[in-house]
Regions:
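Glycine-rich phosphate/pyrophosphate-handling loop used in enzymes and phosphotransfer proteins
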Residues: 1-207
Length: 207
């Protein structure tokens, strides 16, 4: 990230939704989405509003700028480290990519973030715990019901020792409605994980 761009990166500040972490226009506990929907994860926080970092995220995901993961992961540790410390996770788990997309892109952007975050906070990272076994459609143009159907049976537990973990931090690049994080959180809890928290690089605004 060039020095000229650094001042443009403005982290999400209070008030934010106490469940998903989206920036709120006014002081209250929850955004409109979280007031009407029960999430499977326990709590989430995000680093930036998507509109402020959209070009950087595009380059990170689609232009081979894998090194962005180091910078943004370290910023996650710096700005969200207090939250992560309070929830006391056993491990950091990145949201997995489908193997075909991983081959095409060459890297999983969520895993890049998770590795840098783990290094900075001295927390272990488990990239094999959750596997994506279906190539799902892009989520941005789907309604909530279509998002849920799109992700059904898309993830499996990739190891048989998930019960070693009690509290997990999921890491992803973008939070829109939380459907992906909910799907993985529900799967993890079915296998004995008690708490699933989430941190993301960016999200939309709450209403």
């Amino acid at each position: 990230i060039c020095p000229e761009c650094l001042p443009k990166l403005k982290p999400v500040t209070a008030p934010w939704c106490m469940r998903c972490g989206k920036k709120l226009a006014e002081e209250r506990e929850y955004c409109g989405d979280c007031m009407h929907r029960e999430h499977k994860y326990d709590r989430a926080r995000t680093l930036y509003e998507y509109r402020d970092v959209a070009p950087s995220i595009y380059r990170f995901k689609y232009s081979g700028r894998q090194e962005y993961g180091d910078f943004f992961g370290e910023e996650m540790a710096r700005l969200l480290g207090d939250f992560i410390g309070r929830v006391r996770p056993d491990v950091i788990v990145p949201v997995p990519l489908y193997r075909g997309k991983l081959r095409k892109r060459g890297y999983n952007q969520a895993a890049c973030l998770a590795r840098a975050l783990g290094r900075s906070l001295e927390l272990p990272v488990d990239e094999k715990l959750v596997k994506r076994v279906r190539n799902t459609a892009p989520m941005k143009h789907l309604n909530p019901t279509e998002r849920q159907n799109n992700l059904k049976k898309a993830f499996i537990i990739g190891r048989n020792d998930v019960k070693l973990y009690d509290r997990i931090i999921l890491v992803d690049d973008i939070y829109t409605t939380g459907t992906t994080l909910d799907e993985i959180a529900a799967l993890l809890k079915e296998h004995g994980v008690s708490k699933v928290y989430c941190v993301t690089l960016a999200c939309g605004s709450g209403v």
